[in-house]
């Protein structure tokens, strides 16, 4: 059964201040006011399918919007939940913008998942990003959401100026320890018009290479998925508008593709795939498996199996 996320964007809405890296105008899509029209379009094309779906409010800081505004947005979705056309609501917010009372209120209004814009659990990088809270606030927020019965995701950055592999994997270990339902991994990019651009122009910032980022993230995804934690997204969403505004840091429109390819390449080599063998892989990994087989000049057969974990290759006997 296919699962859809129907996203709406609250550009900067509710944010107590602007983080150093952020330009949501370059990243955002449908405004939240278009809930009804977007839902009707979605149902027109997918209503006859066997599917599950969630409406998502991203961008901004949902839980710091005026409560009346939050209620309007949530209630705009509830009729579709009542008709079983949508199964729940998710939103993104800051770790320092939630408490137990709010979580009870959200749970009673069909919120099924909250993504926390943690970015990092390390003080020096939180200070660099001007997030305005200490690492323990992020840890506590993840635990608080989990205890409420609402699903929780963590958004994590990498590629800070001067960051090494050890520092990045301190953050990955935090994810493994806290064990959210899923996470997003995306590299820090310098976007034109952000406060980070000013700092970049005023001094030297050293960023890791694309090849290094792919290696780090492939290693991270491997251990995260082994622990049963989902990967919601790798890299920033691709858009021509965003590409035009990135002036430094890490960005590639096919970053996730490069990571997934690297993971399958490792599995292919480890499995010792021979000529004419039949491989069993997750359906999402079919394209990578065929690409690697062509690259290695191997004639193979591939069988998809959705019960397999991503990046796994089994040889059918």
Model-derived features: positions:
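Auxiliary Fe-S-binding modules of radical SAM enzymes
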Residues: 2, 202-317
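Canonical Radical SAM [4Fe-4S] cluster-binding loop centered on the CxxxCxxC motif
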Residues: 2-34
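Conserved non-cysteine loop/helix-boundary elements of the Radical SAM core domain that shape
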Residues: 27-37, 45, 59-188, 192-214
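Non-transmembrane, interaction-prone alpha-helical and coil segments associated with secretion
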Residues: 53-55
